[in-house]
Amino acid sequence: VHLTMDAFKALFKDTKLEVVRELSQHGEFASNLFVNIKTDKSVIEHVRVVGPIRKYNQVEITKTDAYKLGINPPVRMSGDLEGSETVTLYTDLGSITLENSCIIAARHIHATLLDKETYHLKDKMKAIIDTEKPGVIKNVLVKTSDTYTYELHLDTDDANAFMIKNGDIV
């Protein structure tokens, strides 16, 4: 879950957002705080807030989560939120309903421009996952920035299907 300052204050008041663990992409971190995601059908509890504070609110879930919540979010890249699902986030300190905020994150690769050239990466490419349970993922998008660390991003549904975990080399 990524939050704006207004949403953060609605949920956590004056609580401080602290770094628990740096993530692989420069400047991003797993925070010390958690929210609950609520819809008319169900709740998913204890979802970590990812820092830093953002310019937009974004809730990324899996298709499995979507079934539980009874919603049908689109598969999108981060920040492409128009027409996405509405969810309510709550904590012991507050709640907020976020319209056009919930997506299933598209499969993507973070890469520098040098990585993109070196590995001949292009948008909507195929990624071959060579593991104990191998397969091919189509339509993998490539995000480039000089600050990125070269890495494939999958959600837990995809990772579980290929029997891979965070940090595995594929």
Q: Where in this protein do the model-derived segments appear?
A:
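Short beta-strand-centered segments at strand-helix junctions
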Residues: 1-40, 45-92, 97-130, 138-169
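Active-site phosphate/oxyanion-binding loops
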Residues: 134
